């Protein structure tokens, strides 16, 4: 896409590396901060925290172990952030790597359109007892819910935490499960 047809985004995207940055700026008119992969340092964390006070921060990290680790590390420092998720199936055909730079244009655009806002709260919107009532005992049920929310897969404790960060109530989750 040329500069005239790139989609304008509000906020700053946080991604892992320079190839991710180049790929995102090829499609979107947006500022990008890179973490330099798993070499995320306190200086970069402080920069992201400062930016988050003034404009939306969008975490757009690879769907691999390193990307999940960076995401968890940044989540600890941010009170509010937006998050995009891409799946392994969203990679370009014949791609040997799995990441933002290797995802299809359509997958990147869709992930940004379906991004979720996460907010730390002192009062959970969903209790552990309510969560257990949802009967998300099987991985397939949790995966189906994660897919409806455009999230990567999470285990029980992680999903419970994410649902609260999304500020979803018991009734809202029940509606999603129908």
Curated annotation (Swiss-Prot):
The organism's superkingdom is given as Bacteria
UniProt GO cellular component terms:
cytoplasm
SMART domains, alphabetized: TOPRIM
Record domain Toprim: where: 10-103
Q: How is the cofactor bound?
A: Binds two Mg(2+) per subunit.
Q: Where does Mg(2+) 2 bind?
A: 62, 64
Q: Where in the cell is it found?
A: Cytoplasm
As recorded in UniProt, its EC number(s) are 3.1.26.8
Q: What class of enzyme is it?
A: hydrolase
Using the record, list the residue span of the signal peptide; answer none if the entry has no such feature.
Answer: none
Which Gene Ontology MF annotations are present?
metal ion binding; ribonuclease M5 activity; rRNA binding
The UniProt entry, under InterPro entries, shows:
RNase_M5 (IPR004466), RNase_M5_C (IPR025156), TOPRIM_dom (IPR006171), TOPRIM_RNase_M5-like (IPR034141)
Which cofactor is essential here? Mg(2+)
Record GO biological process: rRNA processing
Reactions the enzyme catalyzes: Endonucleolytic cleavage of RNA, removing 21 and 42 nucleotides, respectively, from the 5'- and 3'-termini of a 5S-rRNA precursor
Q: What does this protein do?
A: Required for correct processing of both the 5' and 3' ends of 5S rRNA precursor. Cleaves both sides of a double-stranded region yielding mature 5S rRNA in one step.
- Tell me the protein's name: Ribonuclease M5
Source organism of this protein record: Mycoplasma pneumoniae (strain ATCC 29342 / M129 / Subtype 1)
